[in-house]
């Protein structure tokens, strides 16, 4: 009810009556009167007036932004730290989290081009992934290309991760052994499988839960992808993979625009446990990749503890070479992508690139030291 009053054009009288009636229909006793009183109080002022009241005594600029954009303060501060020298963009970033994102489709490589998919769906081609198509709205599940498995629903940033993994330069021939160490629920595995098929490669997928393993198997049906249920920290695989993707479990702070309620379900204390897991998965990947092979580490979070800190620690190893992702990450038209920062890792942003805030870094095994 408060959302309708403050964020939509529904009339105050209609919004109040609707939710009072809902309380009565649910047989909530006197709750209907309480709902009526609260919503009528909310309706007295618009959103800006309520925000002004909430931050009347708050002087810290980041805290004021957090209140005004409905973000926990710890998340706003983490984003400001991640932006670094570009921290002046924080208002745009937080506003992007509160805006409705476009629907992103991925044309399946080898089956349909982004140009064809855009013509069929009425969408527009993306600028970062050569397979991306954007739609302003709609239910993609009802679209023929999606139903026919010619396209999938996938944020363009996630597509870029898979593309980067397939393009990263190896030392020596690509023997066609690719590994997706955290494959569930299967979005990137589908893209990797299609890219692998075009390169004559195969993908091994690892997922810790049987349920998510089944999801990946269903999603990648017909592709050269074989999925196993195992713990990615010690999956029991023979080393020697040419390419390994670690799409690490993370806080998901980069996808708050798609799951706005998630910001209130997470705490700063959650991060450290995730970092321990992320480091262990990356260590496992570096054991499994062959000398000259590449590990692509990615998170859907811009939090520095989950991104740069993890990579810097791994890069201290004598057998690891940190690659500049920007050098093999060109846009859909083959030109360099703007706004990727100073490297060697890449951080995408919703307010800059129109994607979730995906982070990616590439590490190449140099030898067996």
Question: Could you describe each region identified by the protein language model?
Answer:
Residues 1-369:
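S-adenosylmethionine
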